[in-house]
Amino acid sequence: MPTINQLVKKPRTSKVKKSTAPALNKGYNSHKKKATDLASPQKRGVCTRVGTMTPKKPNSALRKYARVRLSNNIEVNAYIPGIGHNLQEHSVVLIRGGRVKDLPGVRYHIVRGALDTSGVDGRMQGRSLYGAKKPKEKK
């Protein structure tokens, strides 16, 4: 327990919270060619590579991911959720924060059903997460 004098000399400092999605906290001023502090919930980007990655130790799969150059000129790896996708190089995508626990270096998710990304076909439950439209009812 510090004394009052110790606290007067050096007050308590609050912990600095590190962002889990740092690329969303930067903007880019193309006129001045400088990075700016402009946080946003999602960012637009262009796919530079689309491929698969194997997860960490106890799991086994081929997880789909895309390397995306964002509108603020930062390149990130983003996970493509859902079964099947239509992404290829030069596709324009929208990314949001959210890491994939068993893929190292993947801190972002691609938003399905936005821009060039199609929704998941035949998805009945949790449709809003995968950009799937409500199916037509049969009479």
From Swiss-Prot:
Keyword RNA-binding: yes
A GO cellular component entry from the record: small ribosomal subunit
Positions of the UniProt region annotated as Disordered: 1-44
Keywords: Methylation, Ribonucleoprotein, Ribosomal protein, RNA-binding, rRNA-binding, tRNA-binding
Pfam entry (one): Ribosom_S12_S23
Keyword Transferase: no
GO molecular function: rRNA binding; structural constituent of ribosome; tRNA binding
Modified-residue entries (3-methylthioaspartic acid), positions: D102
GO biological process, one term: translation
Biased segments, Basic residues type: 9-18
Assembly and interaction partners: Part of the 30S ribosomal subunit. Contacts proteins S8 and S17. May interact with IF1 in the 30S initiation complex.
Entries under NCBIfam families matching the protein: rpsL_bact
Function comment: With S4 and S5 plays an important role in translational accuracy.
Family: Belongs to the universal ribosomal protein uS12 family.
Protein name in the entry: Small ribosomal subunit protein uS12
Source organism of this protein record: Macrococcus caseolyticus (strain JCSC5402)
